[in-house]
Curated annotation (Swiss-Prot):
Keyword Cytoplasm: yes
Gene that encodes the chain: acpP
Signal peptide positions on this chain: none
GO biological process: lipid A biosynthetic process
GO cellular component: cytosol; membrane
Function: Carrier of the growing fatty acid chain in fatty acid biosynthesis.
Domain spans labelled Carrier: 1-75
Primary location: cytoplasm
Keywords: Cytoplasm, Fatty acid biosynthesis, Fatty acid metabolism, Lipid biosynthesis, Lipid metabolism, Phosphopantetheine, Phosphoprotein
Name of this protein: Acyl carrier protein
Subcellular location: Cytoplasm
Length: 76
């Protein structure tokens, strides 16, 4: 469920086909995510899942799996 929501957020944010996004999709290398895109995506994730993601934590997100794992661990 978390993955599906994240996938939809990424697809909407970057105007992509959601079916191309997998857990192994890399933000920078595969999606071409720049710092502005990353900031906007994190703001949407924080709003959707009602969590706060620090800048330091954000720097650790390399793949979709990374953010899904973080959300799963840090939400009730």
């Amino acid at each position: 469920m978390v993955f599906e929501k994240i996938k939809a957020l990424i697809a909407t944010q970057l105007s992509l086909d959601a079916s191309t996004i997998t857990l192994d999709t890399r933000f920078k290398e595969d999606l071409g995510l720049d710092s502005l895109d990353a900031l906007e995506l994190v703001m949407e994730v924080e709003k959707t899942f009602q969590i706060n993601i620090s800048d330091a934590t954000l720097q650790n997100f390399k793949t979709v799996q990374d953010i899904v794992f973080y959300i799963t661990k840090n939400t009730p």
